Regions:
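Polytopic transmembrane helical bundles with strong interfacial aromatic enrichment
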Residues: 1-175
Length: 175
């Protein structure tokens, strides 16, 4: 199942790149204060964050792995809270950010939340596969695999709905 962790890295890279690029664009378009200095800081932070994500991946089986993984997860939960608070104008309510962009931040938070949901489903999936490898296949374990698959697929469909909303908001800019 190690190959899944390699595939999962692409999603993590996308999160870092989208978040950093989004802040760069928002600063350069004047949707958030700070202009070019904030844009450069966001780009630099994005590069550091990308390095951290890669370190978390490469060191996951090292003794520091669990701590790095926890820092990585907690930082994503904090980012989700900040994005949601910004979308609700709890942060940056006075910023000249258009409504469509605030909705886009809310949808991006939804994408991230779906990623968390898929991760939880995969944890259950891996646990069941490990039990099957250790002590064999049973009808109950097969049922767990099917149930986990259905749950993860439902979350994945919701994730694509959020992505569709993001694309539509980016093109239409309705509010």
């Amino acid at each position: 199942m190690d190959h899944v962790m390699h595939v999962d890295q692409h999603v993590r890279y996308a999160l870092v790149l989208q978040t950093s690029l989004g802040i760069v664009l928002a600063a350069n378009y004047g949707f958030i204060p700070g202009g070019a200095p904030v844009a450069f800081a966001a780009a630099a932070f994005g590069i550091l964050w990308l390095g951290f994500v890669e370190a978390v991946h490469r060191l996951r089986k090292h003794e520091a792995g669990p701590l790095l993984g926890k820092i990585d997860r907690v930082s994503r939960y904090i980012l989700m809270a900040v994005l949601l608070a910004t979308s609700l104008s709890l942060i940056g309510g006075a910023w000249p950010m258009p409504g469509w962009l605030r909705w886009k931040l809310a949808a991006f938070t939804g994408v991230m939340a779906c990623g968390v949901g898929i991760r939880f489903a995969l944890i259950a999936h891996f646990r069941t596969w490990a039990q099957m490898a250790a002590s064999g296949v049973t009808p109950e374990r097969n049922a767990l695999i099917r149930a986990t698959y259905v749950q993860a697929t439902a979350v994945l469909v919701l994730l694509w709905v959020f992505i569709g909303v993001i694309v539509w908001l980016s093109i239409a800019k309705p509010v």
